[in-house]
Amino acid sequence: MERIFDEELKALKGRILALGGLVEEQVQRSIKALVERDSDLARGTIEEDHRVNRMEVEIDEECVRLIALRQPAAGDLRFLTTAMKIVTDLERMGDLAVDTCERALELNEEPPLKPYIDIPRMADAAQRMLKEALDAFVNRDAELARKVCRDDDFVDDLNKQVFRELVSFMVEDPHTITRAIRISFISKYLERVADHATNIAEMVVYMVEGRIIRHMVP
């Protein structure tokens, strides 16, 4: 019975990684749709969101089934409750990719305001944080999880930098206000993606060490 449970947990990890990979791809596609002004890609990415939602529900149901059926001890129980929280964060990241695509569709109907430089940097950093947070989860690596928490400051700083630059555009030319606000939304969405990756990392520390580090300096 224990061997069967171990196999079930291994399969669950694989499904969570698959969902994480899909979400990472959704974020990447949303930024590509923005930078390359590809509205077809934006619409296609929005249509793919149902896969993220379906996988989130299926994984959540599997976690509940395993808790009820296997009645896991402390360590495995923390793993399963952490997994349930992680897939919720992943689903919300998918929603943020959809939000980004919706703003991209609006921006693609207007002349470009400026070249996108910091937005792709934010996206790269947020995707890296997500990948490392999931690696930390699978490998039970609390130190890597703490690194993800620290990396969140970089994305926060970029978001502030983008906002300051956009304010300058709006002050100098009121005609840019609508476009600048839409870009600022996208910057905020990416900051929130990084925040969700940080949430996952914090939960990994709890899973591994039984310590809650939210609102603490890692």
Regions found by a protein language model. Name each.
Residues 1-218:
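Cytosolic, long alpha-helical scaffolding segments
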